[in-house]
Amino acid sequence: MDTLDKLTILADAAKFDAACTSSGVDRDPQAGKVGMASAAGCCHSFTPDGRCITLLKVLLSNACCYDCAYCVNRSSAQTKRATFTPQELAELTVDFYKKNYIEGLFLSSGVIGSPDHTTELMIECLSYLRNELLFNGYVHAKVIPGTDPDLIDAIGRLADRLSVNLELPSSTSLTKLCPHKNAETVTKPMSFIHRLRVSEERQLLEAKNASKGIVKSAGKPKGIVIPTQKQIIKEGLALRSNCLKNTFMRSSRVSSNKRSFSPAGQSTQIIIGASPESDNQILHLSQALYQQFELKRVFFSAYIPVIEDHRLPELDTPVPLRREHRLYQADWLMRYYAFSPDELVSPEAPWLDLEIDPKLGWALAHLNQFPVEIMDAPLEILLRVPGIGPTGARRIIAARRRSRLTFDDLKRLGIQLKRSHHFLTCCGVRDASAPLDQELIKQRVIADAKASSYNKTRRRIESSQLRLF
């Protein structure tokens, strides 16, 4: 079997893995080396200048000794198997880079014999790629649960980001669908990666302080960053586009390009719809993972029924793509807007509303906190208004220093008034066309969304495009 035949099989086998966007690494080009990592990201991500860049998403092998019920590569599956040699895959990656097909590599694998043996092969591939072929581009590597810590350390020195897939939202479902795995084997490498990153950060900070003659630095604990009013005004005047650094995101005291071990951190993936857990359980799990292991991302992957198994949903079960989308929106609110899971879901209402986004759902459930006066609302309150994002909120704060704002002014600032005008007053004046009833607001927002040019275009494309699976 030649290399391209293997690629056809192993790229297709990797398509169900969602946790492969890049990441926060901004490594400059180096003399004599091939490629560079961009903080803007790859794997069909868009850079600030509009470029779309991709990575090669592939398995080292789809042979696997595990028999996870949901996996197309499980040991009992009747599928064509293939395995790259480490050198073969490394050379293919550089060849694709030189042809401008990709700017990075996402590397995973089925379990060949044991987690340690598989990881050793992945390390051999990445070592050849980095040290012999001098590839300097972005690399995301999967850590297989049960891998020896020394091997995790080694692969973390070669990859920009590591990920350990949690796969299922509860230990009960993991035991039922993945007989070779348990929650401890998944969380143990997560904890090890976290400890190594914290240790390296501490060493880098101590070295930095020592170079400045500082004996000891108290430092500020990590957490939600609440900018000062002066910072907000300055940013509001300067902002021209949406920028993640201006949200309530967690701060890092060490730049990624200073780190040697997994500089872009770690992520995980949770499969949605293969097991009965609610959105309430999933979002609380996500919050715990962010807090305990400082994950950069929790990815959600809507389960696609392609395997007939009594433990899984029927083959004709719809793929829960909208639920996946709502979970991503809720996750975004938790990571960047300082929402907690308890504000979005609860044991009494454990499912996100599929018709409206979670931020609007929260606002409709808390109408007693609205309308918000645009001239004096603080940043954290403005960010809770549907239709106002971090850039818009800072523009409002900067603009209201100069003049009294009207709804026309908000429109010029780029605020989505179709959503936000229901929840705002400008100098004490409410938009007369905005209803005060919860259900009327919901139906109007849904109607506006259906009539949007984006959704019209999407429906037209979906009706004319052949689905791959």
Question: Can you name each region flagged by the protein language model?
Answer:
Residues 1-63, 416, 424, 432-460, ...:
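Flexible, acidic/Gly-rich N-terminal and inter-domain linker regions that tether
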Residues 55, 68, 107, 164, ...:
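Conserved, mostly hydrophobic/aromatic
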Residues 57-58, 87-98:
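Short, charged beta->alpha transition segments
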Residues 58-87:
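Canonical Radical SAM [4Fe-4S] cluster-binding loop centered on the CxxxCxxC motif
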Residues 90, 113-337, 343:
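Conserved AdoMet/S-adenosylmethionine-binding subsite of the radical SAM
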Residues 311-383, 419-469:
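Long, highly charged, low-complexity intrinsically disordered interaction regions
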Residues 399-400:
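Residue-level signature of tetratricopeptide-repeat
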